[in-house]
């Protein structure tokens, strides 16, 4: 039915280099009770977890988990959803958007249940679950790159998008429509603020940041769809067409890729659940699932109206190619007042800033794990601060050196798509071991294979699109 306890303890030993300092007491063959009543709900905790930022504090609750999920779930990619509809049309756009939402919700449920697949043992990191499911070598191969890409890559995209949005905001506020700062300077301003916000000691302490980020995300999504509905209520739709002109394989799958990118974020589910207390009477999966349902309901309330209203208002005027989010923000605000445009850009920038520390946390946790393994002691405040400054500088340098990364979002994101749509299904089969050819086994195999096939098709379509359209690779010239 589940992983043997001894295997999980062996996993911890292998991850920490086998040092006794980082190993739990010798495991027995019987399941260990969750000792939440004795240690504040931190049952199954190994010593090294007390030193790492993701599991340093387990005093979270349904509210902290909800806002963490909201802040990381309302991503900047939601702005691109109307572009996907411009390529797919009303019917197929709605079907794919809905199927993707349900698919993401299902795989999230799988991860929530796998967090404590064995009583007394908590797996609070996606990479660790991959290793527990597929073995050390294969688990690291399949898990580390996508998770590190989703962490560092998301922060890099946030620097590019947030920096460009700052520049656009300054242009809107200026009288002559010029920005007083260059793109690099705007990237630097964004990175410095984000770097400061990343100095919170652990994931649970980021609750205030997530709260602000969630409200900012809800605010800009709501205003973006309300403005065209309010201003176009008396307007006829003669000038707007909803016909899809290009029905090629490349065009269609690029649009599907834009929708798929919205549903990233499963790399943070286990980490957020790791901040919750757990005991035999109230396991963390119950609290986490309530948070997942609330956050996904709010994300749907933001995402679906924005997509439908903006596509209804602009139709074929929306570029269906994707690319920088700032171009779409400019399109959505150009027909409205300066105050409205400033509000949308400002809330969007704050949302990006608040998302940055949460997305950076898995990378910080992995780097600190390496440090702790070598030094056999927890990272000091200075060391932790310098590690986060270093990671932020890396993201800033990549953003300045490769400012065209938003044009490659579907190509690179197709690899990380497996984290959301594929791996959880096979993890469930590996750990829970349902009876072969049972409905649950067949369903997870089918869903997992569909996710892998989708990833391959998106990779092929993105590569073909690059071959056809080319890429303006403006290295170090943002």
Swiss-Prot record:
Chain intervals for the UniProt region annotation (Disordered): 15-45
Main location: membrane
Membership in a protein family: Belongs to the amino acid/polyamine transporter 2 family. Amino acid/auxin permease (AAAP) (TC 2.A.18.2) subfamily.
Alphabetical list of Pfam families matching this protein: Aa_trans (PF01490)
Bilayer topology: Multi-pass membrane protein
PANTHER family with a match to the protein in the record: OS05G0424000 PROTEIN-RELATED
Provenance organism: Arabidopsis thaliana (Mouse-ear cress)
Topological domains annotated Extracellular: 87-89, 162-177, 227-241, 313-340, 403-406, 461-478
Transmembrane segments: 64-86, 90-112, 141-161, 178-198, 206-226, 242-262, 292-312, 341-361, 380-402, 407-429, 440-460
Any one biological process term the GO annotation gives: amino acid transport
This protein's name: Lysine histidine transporter-like 7
Function: Amino acid transporter.
Compartments in which it is found: Cell membrane
Top-level taxon of origin: Eukaryota
Sequence ranges on the Cytoplasmic membrane side: 1-63, 113-140, 199-205, 263-291, 362-379, 430-439
An annotated GO cellular component: plasma membrane
Keywords for the protein's UniProt record, in alphabetical order: Amino-acid transport, Cell membrane, Membrane, Transmembrane, Transmembrane helix, Transport
